Amino acid sequence: DANLDHNIERMLEAYAAQTWHTSGYVPKDIEYPKQRQVNKLPVIDHVMQHAALNPVEDDIRNTIYYHCPAGSKGKGTHYFYNLIKRDIFNSPQQDTFYCLPIDIHHYFQCIDHNLLKSEYRRKIKDRKLLSFIDELVDSFNPGIVLGVKLAQLLGQLFLARFDYLALRCFDIIDDPEKFHYWQARYVSDMLVTCRTQQQTQLLCEGVSFLNERFEKFCRHGLHHY
């Protein structure tokens, strides 16, 4: 606080001149809830990253699927818990009978720098901000650093387009050959896997009904989302 004005002026000058360099990382091992290694930075680096991110953060977060609340203001673990609870209580029991937790093993360590840079360039056009983010990304290898807000946001953005593609069944409806192949598989597999009264009722609606149902999945995503 004693040198606040001086530090702010120094940070602004470094940002404007594109001469800012991320400080050295201090690794820290975390054991709970899962074993991983995060990296600590001095306070000045966090202030710099938050300030640089501020003008574009809302726009980037609006790109990310809303079921990814980590690091978002007003969201977090309880927000995600309430989303899951809502789905369970508002959906038929047979539709929520199973829960499959999926995790990308060592996700942050596997992110390719060039692919990540091309991804955030879809949303950010300011040259100085791009230079600042590029420097942060390249300051850690392999992958991107775990333990700073900006890196967490970039990690979510990196998967954003994949999330929406998954919800739309990977846009197979835009490829007639692929769409009709999987539509036929959907109907035929329903015949083989029929186990419940509800599935029997769906089959009794006929092939045309099942074809239309599959098309709705592809156009609008699964109804839970």
Predicted feature residues:
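Conserved polymerase palm-domain catalytic core
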Residues: 82, 87-210, 219-225
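Charge-rich, low-complexity amphipathic helices
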Residues: 74-78, 176, 212
